[in-house]
Amino acid sequence: MARASSRNSSEEAWGSLQAPQQQQSPAASSLEGAIWRRAGTQTRALDTILYHPQQSHLLRELCPGVNTQPYLCETGHCCGETGCCTYYYELWWFWLLWTVLILFSCCCAFRHRRAKLRLQQQQRQREINLLAYHGACHGAGPVPTGSLLDLRLLSAFKPPAYEDVVHHPGTPPPPYTVGPGYPWTTSSECTRCSSESSCSAHLEGTNVEGVSSQQSALPHQEGEPRAGLSPVHIPPSCRYRRLTGDSGIELCPCPDSSEGEPLKEARASASQPDLEDHSPCALPPDSVSQVPPMGLASSCGDIP
């Protein structure tokens, strides 16, 4: 009897457990079926990826929808109840965009650094130029020990100011100096004197061939005068020396400045008072020509 009662109680308990399962709503059963179908679909998709890698791009995900209406996600994963979501790091253009941004930032930083270094170098060069200019303008100043820029050396190469060059142009160097008390004569007179064959070049105190008659007449002045000519005396102050281009000395008598004729012809056609009046050495110092060019300087003086 005890065994029969225990068997009846176990059957009643089993029946009570099966009763709630049979009383479940059809919605729960449909949801459970969808879950099982989804699991089966994922299993088949996984099998496709493992055994058929070339067909992995055809993977579609079955997502449960609203009111037991599932949908497929061709790209991405199930997101919410009606959409498909994809993470940014899963997109190829996401990484491309970041790569472009990083490269552009590096280029900008490199150009900024180069521009900064160039500006610093220009500023240093400008400061060095200013220091050199002030040192050259104000003369030698205190130079720090071990300085690579010697301002005292640069002051020697200071160019003149623009106003000084415009208003005071550079003058040629002075000509050969002469002894005091001897007036200057122009190079044109010496050139005319040599072109008329009134004098010739002699080195170291030789006599002039053109005035040989006057030189020979000098001894006769103490005795009798020559026939046909009045005694003419050439004063020592009316003869001068002229330096030639071959480092020689040419002795020339002073020509007549008014007519431009040699002194020999003037003596032959004029008297002694006329020669003294028209002699350029007897003229006042104001009427004497200006200083000749360098290298043709000459002076009236005694013959050495």
UniProtKB/Swiss-Prot annotation:
Keyword Repeat: yes
Domain of life assignment: Eukaryota
Alphabetized UniProt keyword annotations: Repeat
Motif position, PPxY motif 1: 159-162
Region (Disordered): 1-26, 206-235, 252-304
Phenotype upon changing residue 162 to A: Abolishes interaction with NEDD4
Polar residues bias: start-end ranges: 209-218
InterPro entries in alphabetical order: WBP1-like (IPR021684), WW_domain-binding (IPR051994)
A single MF term (Gene Ontology): WW domain binding
Residue ranges of the motif PPxY motif 2: 172-176
Pfam families for this protein: WBP-1
Domain remark in the UniProt entry: The PPxY motif 2 mediates interaction with WWOX. Both PPxY motifs mediate interaction with NEDD4.
Subunit (UniProt): Binds to the WW domain of YAP1, WWP1 and WWP2. Interacts with WWOX. Interacts with NEDD4.
UniProt protein name: WW domain-binding protein 1
Record organism: Mus musculus (Mouse)
Species lineage: Eukaryota, Metazoa, Chordata, Craniata, Vertebrata
